[in-house]
Amino acid sequence: LPYGRIASFLREVFGLAPSEGSLVNWAREAKRNAQPAIEKIKEYIMSSSVVGFDESGCYCNKRLDWAWIAQTVYYTLLFRANGRNSKVLTDKFGDSLERMTAVTDRHSAYFALQFLNHQVCMAHLLRELQYLSELKDKQDWSDKIANLFREAIHERNSNPSAIIPKASWLERLDNLLKLNICNFGKKFETLKKGLIKCRDYIFNFLEDPMIPSDNNGSERGIRKLKIKLKNSCTFRSDFGADALLELHSIVETAKKHNKTPFNAIQALFEV
């Protein structure tokens, strides 16, 4: 929420009357005290074997920036950059990317990087297939691929620790991708080409139980930023943007360790 609305909320609900300047000073103190923890979170992510990535546009000082998230089962790091190309991650994480399995959407920047392994988000693909099924309901090509993906996800969920060979699943997918769907329209052809391009990264979650089939963790982690931008549309300062992303990193990481957001923020004022 903007500082003015926070001050209004504290006044109306709790009878407190901090000035907006006090709120800024508290945010500045929390951000400063959070730096050692932010660096430690980054180190843990760089040493992690499976990392989910996502990015979202955010306006700051009337300028389009990009908020990025890198997250694992135990850690979340959000940060701001002026672009959404692969160089952002290279500059941030260096050669540690080569030791990671990345879980991402199909944004081209992720495929320009040399990850150890890669998994595309099945939830994204299923949404795109559902859209095509609704767009043209007199065909079953998109439904067949969606059912194949759901079957693979069910197989993993039913056998959470098993190493499941992906060869037979790829063969079934290839048979569907060989079908002529020119008559279905451009959007079908576009998705078909996209699936062919990322074919090798669709079923990797079957062969490694540590790899999730979706990137929902990254989407959840960046969702509060989108809510903030719906409320106030933009960040008025670089400090405000960075403070929100860094404090959100602290809170999300704390929650993954069964700590409350209140305790996480409170700890920043006890340093």
Task: Give names to the regions the model predicted.
Residues L1-V271:
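Catalytic center-proximal scaffold of phosphoryl-transfer enzymes
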